[in-house]
Amino acid sequence: MTDNIAATIKEKRERLHMTQKEFADALGLSKYGDRTIRRWERGETKPTGAELKAVIDFPDTPPYPNNENGRYRMIDLFAGIGGTRLGFHQTNAVNVVFSSEWDKFAQKTYHANYGDFPDGDITKIDEKDIPDHEILVGGFPCVAFSQAGLKKGFNDTRGTLFFDIARIIKEKKPHAFLLENVKNLLGHDKGRTFSIIKNTLEELNYTVYYNIFAAKDFGVPQNRERIYIVGFNKEKVRNHEHFTFPTPLKTKTRVGDILEKSVDNKYTLSDALWNGHQRRKLVNAAAGKGFGYGLFNENSPYTNTISARYYKDGSEILIEQKGSNPRKITPREASRLQGFPSDFIIPVSDTQAYKQFGNSVAVPVINAIAEKIISTLDS
């Protein structure tokens, strides 16, 4: 019987293309869970009934397969783990015909949830080889343009990742696009960066709309502000002036709504780490700097922004625990902060999961904007 259980566990893990560490974290095992998995697979120990059930029940089919009957073809650039795709998927209106993401761990999460394996580095993909599509979505790093202040147009964007978005738009001429970026893009390089982006898109015959939204105003308890840039092709979408951004719901949010009922001790800060956080906060306060840890409880309305560096020490979002040091949020809680559904599969280690959700988007904001874009295209 032990041999059968060992074989079942190993076969399941390998079929999911997960390491022992990834599988242990995905199953919610304790700090040295990879050792536990190793012992199970060797038949040295047996999982409890609940642990074996967790292994068997772990999903091995994507919860969000592509809707090939979607009326609008879409491509997903700088896709990450597909948060933007998910927001559009929820409209039931799109068929994703191409995706691109270079990070191998993000590719793994993307594949587990959508069944598609994204193409790699977009800078190495010829725009002519990308399938025709009506909608383009993507985010891109906020960088200064080397020739800022000159022509302020398409040619000034060469050598940046935005250029890859622009060259694809120029070649494929989608009906609409949605780009997401940090709020500071507006003021970056004294406004020159955004000016070049907007002028480039307008030069390509698009009417450009933009707005800043906070995730907390769309039902998730996170103070995450981002700029959303929407464009419509003037020739293909003649009623683009009917487009309006969604009105934020601004319903009250509560951190307790995303917290798990039972959390492993591995997420609790050690005395050394907690003392270090407190010491640095005092030093920064004395120096007039605002940086320090962020401490929240179940009644807090929202948290700070979760970032890709959260895996390092978790300082931006710590959860109070009575009679104990604070703890980091779990990867599942991080996913909920971004509005991902509970059945979203996390097939990577905790470290990678924190990076992925920190780099991702607030899905409810994307979905609200997606509905408006689809409505404009439909009309």
Curated annotation (Swiss-Prot):
Its EC number is 2.1.1.37. One of its GO terms (molecular function) is DNA (cytosine-5-)-methyltransferase activity. InterPro entries: C5-MTase, C5_DNA_meth_AS, C5_MeTfrase, C5_meth_CS, Cro/C1-type_HTH, Lambda_DNA-bd_dom_sf, SAM-dependent_MTases_sf. The active site is at residue 142. It comes from the Bacteria. Signal peptide: none annotated. It holds the Pfam family DNA_methylase. The keyword DNA-binding applies. Gene3D superfamilies: 3.90.120.30, lambda repressor-like DNA-binding domains (1.10.260.40), Vaccinia Virus protein VP39 (3.40.50.150). Residues 9-66 form the HTH cro/C1-type domain. The keyword Transcription regulation applies. It is an enzyme of class 2 (transferase). Keywords: DNA-binding, Methyltransferase, Plasmid, Restriction system, S-adenosyl-L-methionine, Transcription, Transcription regulation, Transferase. Residues 72-379 form the SAM-dependent MTase C5-type domain. Belongs to the class I-like SAM-binding methyltransferase superfamily. C5-methyltransferase family. This is Type II methyltransferase M.SsoII. It comes from Shigella sonnei. The gene is ssoIIM.
